[in-house]
């Protein structure tokens, strides 16, 4: 924790530097950042689970308390207006006293609608950052989520501070424990629901605390890219298991995927081959490399796997050029990772918001930036048997290059995805996921 405290001091200095630069450029007095508010369920008296504004948790690891505010101007100590109502219905958050509190000026707010008393007297030249524009209107903000400010913050968010990197290491360390427990639950005969419970118990987080809905997929369910159904019934035959699950630490996410075969067979060999592809692509990561180039290179590796495992015929370059690899690997290679699972800034060329579009042939790629030191990325190649995409392919001449008997052989296994979280350093890569022990 001492190391976190040391890094947090530097983190706040860097965030203040960024704010000072952008508000000077945009002639603003400062930023007022709203943690967010509860959303009430329609025709009900219950709220949806609260999700904090990522711009807010960049400054303080307060991720579960609505109606909080930050007042920052890049010069003075940030002011945290911390919501602490008098409430006998709900648990009221304790006044923070952790390592980071010495770096902010904490003021307590007991009634959410009295926040104006804590804001600058004249907010004409202050920008509101947050989701609730109706609240911003009531408070009198005329500058709300200005594009120039948001683009600047999102662009620079890709460059992680040492504090952020340490938080993400801890998020990986926690998630690795969950993955190991889930793997054991799979081999011990657990259902998807039971495996999920083992994972959550091991990471010590609820379904609303982990950074995204876990994908716990047995057998053919692994072909559904964002499968979250969680069947309670155990399958009659246990073939494969895909787990895409992360953990949260101080508001920072990990995002890890592994795939397992229940028995030693050709699907197990395919997993090993894709694992080798993933590691080869990670070895290619270094500052100056375009993420788009890594994605396209991965498609050539996938093409070779299709040939090696007799799923397709022809040559690797042709399979890529004809879009056949897109049928088996339809998503992007990965994305930026941080305060959000799909962290902001992945398409930005510069701090003014110049957009770098994904290649026309690869529209689902979530990152098109040139890599730099201190960025954190996921690398997650996949290979799936997705019937809806294969049905489209059957409509044209490309169907002749597919070995449909081999497709049928692999269909019950669903698919494979392998995903690690990687820090780009100037002279090396740091594969956090593997370094914490999730080797396979």
From Swiss-Prot:
Q: Which UniProt keywords apply?
A: Dipeptidase, Hydrolase, Manganese, Metal-binding, Metalloprotease, Protease
Domain of life, per lineage: Bacteria
Reactions mediated catalytically: Xaa-L-Pro dipeptide + H2O = an L-alpha-amino acid + L-proline
Cofactor note (record) = Binds 2 manganese ions per subunit.
Please provide, in alphabetical order, the Gene Ontology terms of the cellular component aspect for this entry. Answer: cytosol
One MF annotation (Gene Ontology) recorded for this entry: proline dipeptidase activity
* Gene3D superfamilies with a match to the protein in the record: Creatinase/methionine aminopeptidase superfamily, Creatinase/prolidase N-terminal domain
Annotated residues for binding of Mn(2+) 1: 255, 335, 380, 419
**Pfam families the record matches:** PepQ_N, Peptidase_M24
E.C. number: 3.4.13.9
Q: Which HAMAP family match?
A: X_Pro_dipeptid
Role according to the record? Splits dipeptides with a prolyl residue in the C-terminal position.
Which family would the database say this protein is a member of? Belongs to the peptidase M24B family. Bacterial-type prolidase subfamily.
Q: Give the protein name, as stated in the record.
A: Xaa-Pro dipeptidase
Query: What organism is this sequence from?
Result: Shewanella denitrificans (strain OS217 / ATCC BAA-1090 / DSM 15013)
The organism's taxonomy opens as: Bacteria, Pseudomonadati, Pseudomonadota, Gammaproteobacteria, Alteromonadales
- Gene this chain is encoded by: pepQ
